[in-house]
Amino acid sequence: MAENQNNLIWIDLEMTGLDPERDRIIEIATLVTDANLNILAEGPVLAVHQSDEQLGLMDEWNVRTHTGSGLVERVKASPFNDHDAELQTIEFLKQWVPAGTSPICGNSVGQDRRFLFRYMPELEAYFHYRYLDVSTLKELARRWKPEILAGFKKQNTHQALDDIRESVAELAYYREHFIQK
């Protein structure tokens, strides 16, 4: 394990909904890659405890998805609150990436960052202000080279670590098939 300012921090959150004023984080996972997208380490995958009242505010899609994956039960049984999960994640990241050097990496990470800013501000501040958002490349490919889109299929498990691994693989796919070297 070696701290390196060129390493990239990948993150995914599962939430009870899309509004950080009302909804909450229920799972967080991170992993670190080198600049060439080789996975160096996977961080803790933590269900974040939320009250039954908070979970009761989820819409039908979230109830179905997070109950079906087993996440709701993991959230109810979790001993970790937002701050606990935040600190464990930061401790992992410190081993691999200096604070303030990695952009926040993943798919639609602007949404994740909104929740981090509200509920895990120390972790949000650990990232550089820039974004490495794979969904940007997907949108550009859809417009400029739509024939490549069928070549990458996501499993859409909506489990944080699975989703991050897919984001890394998706960026590698776009690097090979869309970005000219």
From Swiss-Prot:
GO terms for biological process: DNA metabolic process. The keyword Disulfide bond does not apply. SMART domains: EXOIII (SM00479). It is an enzyme of class 3 (hydrolase). It is found in: Cytoplasm. It comes from the Bacteria. The active site is at 129. Its EC number is 3.1.15.-. Disulfide bonds: none annotated. Residues 8-171 form the Exonuclease domain. InterPro entries: Exonuclease_RNaseT/DNA_pol3, Oligoribonuclease, RNaseH-like_sf, RNaseH_sf. The keyword Hydrolase applies. GO terms for molecular function: 3'-5'-RNA exonuclease activity; nucleic acid binding. GO terms for cellular component: cytoplasm. Its main location: cytoplasm. Keywords: Cytoplasm, Exonuclease, Hydrolase, Nuclease. 3'-to-5' exoribonuclease specific for small oligoribonucleotides. Belongs to the oligoribonuclease family. PANTHER family: OLIGORIBONUCLEASE, MITOCHONDRIAL. This is Oligoribonuclease. The gene is orn.
